[in-house]
Every structure is written in C-alpha cells, then in structure tokens.
Curated annotation (Swiss-Prot):
This is Defensin-like protein 141. Its main location: secreted. Disulfide bonds join 31-76, 40-59, 45-70, 49-72. InterPro entries: DEFL (IPR010851). It is found in: Secreted. It comes from Arabidopsis thaliana (Mouse-ear cress). Keywords: Antimicrobial, Disulfide bond, Fungicide, Plant defense, Secreted, Signal. Residues 1-24 form the signal peptide. Pfam families: SLR1-BP. GO terms for cellular component: extracellular region. The keyword Signal applies. One of its GO terms (biological process) is killing of cells of another organism. Belongs to the DEFL family.
Length: 78
C-alpha cells in the first residue's frame, strides 16, 4: 500500500513538472532568420545558426521552385 502511494506521488510530481516545462516553452517566442552567407548543407546550416543565434538551423524550401535556404530558428530574446 505504501509503495503504491509513493509511486503515485512521484508520478503526479513528474507530470506537474512536465506541464510547467511545456507551458514555459509555449510562452517563449520564436524568431527566424534566413542565413544567406552559406549554401544550405544540414551540418553547415545548423552550426552557423548555433554559433550566430544559439538556435536551430534547418534547410527549407518554401515553394517547389525555390532553392534550399538555411533558416535559423531561435528564441527572440537572444
């Protein structure tokens, strides 16, 4: 009986912490910037974005006719 109560307590505690983390991530605004100084390569794009804005770089193609572009997604506060 005691083990199940302790287990339930920890599960509720962990779920509460997860909800707080998710809410914090949703409140944080995301900005984006096209990094034109490099050709789009997955490693290059991500490395430059991380160095420049502490963000996540991805190669994207907005329309089928466009070339791949390096887009940097980062928290607006940085």
């Amino acid at each position: 009986m005691t083990k199940s109560i302790i287990s339930a307590f920890f599960i509720i505690l962990i779920l509460g912490m997860m909800v707080n983390e998710i809410e914090g991530q949703q409140q944080q605004q995301r900005c984006e910037e096209a990094l034109t100084e490099i050709d789009c390569g997955a490693g290059n794009c991500n490395a430059l974005c991380l160095q420049k804005r502490k963000g996540l770089g991805r190669c994207v193609q907005r329309t089928p006719c466009d070339k791949l572009k390096c887009m940097c997604y980062y928290p607006c506060s940085s």
